[in-house]
Amino acid sequence: MQSQSKLTRRAAAATLVAMTMCLPAAFAAEKSFDRTLSVNGPVTLRVSTGSGYIRVSPGSDNQVHIVGHVKSGGNSWLGWGGSSDDAVAKVAANPPIDQAGNIIRVGDDHGNDWAHHVSIDYEVTTPANTMLVAQSGSGDLQISNINGTVKASTGSGSIHAEKLGSGSRLETGSGTIDASNLMGSTTLQTGAG
């Protein structure tokens, strides 16, 4: 009986340790930001994220609207000196968005340490004639009704594309590509999907 009791205690301890390790992910911080940028002509837009999704659709001819959903990676113990909650708050307060006229970059981390501790999902509306580059390390891409050339790539996510401009290129390392109503020539490439 005593050995069975020891096994029960060990199993309970192992369960407690496993649950404790999962708690940071279960209670991960999350915040959002919302920005609208004015443009006055053809737009060149670059959107990148490490592990989030990217959705791009057409909107107003003179605005780019960006909504970001920032989530912590739960990696506060990796030595950057701050908590995951701090990283999420910093990104939400000062999103990684740069604009130089009609050239807009979204998601470039500019060497910030927080970039390794958060995941950002992007929902973007932009003029239909935008030239777009969208990259995600491991998230899905959904792009529709963009008449400009689109270069979209993801390492391990899927790509859903509809009505893209001629000369577009869609690539995924290990996901699937679902594309329809593409204009002109378009290159589709998948590694293992």
Segment roles from a protein language model:
Residues 13-24:
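Bacterial N-terminal signal peptides
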Residues 9-10:
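Basic polycationic patches enriched in arginine
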Residues 2, 6, 26-49, 53-136, ...:
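Acidic (Asp/Glu) and glycine-rich low-complexity loops/linkers
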